[in-house]
């Protein structure tokens, strides 16, 4: 009977501590991932595409889905962005992410949903939704998969 009491007391004492640690970990994951996205916004709005791309995993295994097309790899993703937003006759506009929902998938993974909007110099506002998978690496949190759609 005494052993049961000890186990019960330990459970009642440790459960809130463990649960609190998990919440703290979730909060730090959410904060770190949101920070990457805010840094991407800032870089984009400076027209710094290389800076924007630091939020992505620099690997041939990065995947980017958009417009029913798969782009594989960091370099190909950078080239896609350059062609779409920095080639002649194109403008990057002002980027804003909103409606972020960041769900930690443990201490080194996160699933992110959100909305994006560009405000272009001509007043147009292309926009859409995205889902991202983030992974924590030794050099920080990086997007390993991006699925972005545009409103029709």
Predicted ranges, named:
Residues 1-7:
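Bacterial N-terminal signal peptides that target proteins for export
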Residues 3, 14-55:
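Short, low-complexity N-terminal intrinsically disordered segments enriched in polar/charged residues
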Residues 31-34, 49-108:
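A solvent-exposed, acidic/Ser-Thr-rich amphipathic alpha-helical stretch
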Residues 81, 98-102, 115-118, 129-135:
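Hydrophobic/aromatic beta-strand elements that line small-molecule binding cavities or substrate pockets
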Residues 88-91, 118-126:
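Short, cysteine-centered beta-strand-loop-beta hairpins and adjacent loop/turn segments enriched
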Residues 107-116:
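A short hydrophobic beta-strand element
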Residues 127-152:
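Short beta-strand edge/turn micro-motifs at domain boundaries
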